[in-house]
């Protein structure tokens, strides 16, 4: 009997592969436990259709991330912080403050966990890197000014 593997099965194959197995193994174990489906024409057509939809969604998501990367590259955030008499910042600028400023000034919401930078402790222009997903990284600038 031919089965379409839904999940990876050790010593048999990976999800998405079509395998020839003995009837008892296919019916009583693979299909019963949810590891596979009988490889009928209908199941194969649905699997191919789902695979195409998934690929299209991935292309759409990557295109949106590339657009976001382009938008972010044009941004320079302005952040004002109190400074001491010697010109050093009190505390510094954290990822949380950068994410909040990005949302307030550019209306782009990014999780602070995806920002790749340390706390900035000096005035001036700094570059911030962002992990957007699917191996796409963006960079934007922040300008830290004295209050």
Swiss-Prot record:
BP-aspect Gene Ontology terms: translation
Disulfide feature: none
UniProtKB keywords: Ribonucleoprotein, Ribosomal protein, RNA-binding, rRNA-binding
SUPFAM superfamilies: L9 N-domain-like, Ribosomal protein L9 C-domain
UniProt xrefs under PROSITE patterns: RIBOSOMAL_L9
GO cellular component entries: ribonucleoprotein complex; ribosome
Described function: Binds to the 23S rRNA.
Family per similarity comment: Belongs to the bacterial ribosomal protein bL9 family.
Name of the protein in question: Large ribosomal subunit protein bL9
Organism lineage string: Bacteria, Pseudomonadati, Campylobacterota, Epsilonproteobacteria, Campylobacterales
């Amino acid at each position: 009997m031919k089965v379409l593997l839904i999940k990876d099965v050790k010593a048999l194959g990976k999800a998405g592969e079509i395998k020839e197995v003995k009837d008892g193994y296919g019916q009583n174990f693979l299909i019963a436990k949810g590891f596979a489906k009988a490889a009928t024409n209908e199941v194969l057509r649905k699997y191919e259709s789902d695979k195409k939809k998934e690929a299209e969604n991935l292309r759409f998501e990557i295109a949106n991330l590339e657009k976001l990367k382009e938008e972010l590259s044009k941004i320079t955030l302005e952040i004002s912080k109190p400074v001491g008499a010697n010109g050093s910042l009190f505390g510094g600028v954290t990822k949380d403050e950068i994410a909040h400023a990005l949302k307030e000034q550019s209306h782009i919401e990014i999780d602070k966990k995806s920002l790749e930078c340390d706390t900035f402790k000096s005035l001036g222009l700094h570059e911030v890197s962002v992990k957007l997903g699917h191996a796409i990284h963006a960079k934007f600038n922040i300008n830290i000014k004295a209050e």
